[in-house]
Amino acid sequence: FDIYVHNDRVYLVEVKSHADIEDVEWFYKRAEIYEKIRGRRPDKLVLVAVHIDEDAYERAKELGIEVIYGAIIP
């Protein structure tokens, strides 16, 4: 993932051409690791994907990950 900091706010951004549920879970896990190392929770998690599986999209919503996508694959 990439880290974007602006006005003391931290955003973690993951960019994928195709995101599946494993990608979502791994991104969330890495965000937890970031929090443990830095002692600070990211202000926002953002997943950008051209295509995302429907179950991955639903899981991202459950985890509070903002998703920017081109198409949801059923």
Predicted regions and their residues:
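Domain-level recognition of nuclease-like catalytic cores that cleave nucleotide substrates
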Residues: 44-74
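Arginine/glycine-rich "motif VI" loop of SF2 helicases in the C-terminal RecA-like domain
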Residues: 33-41, 62
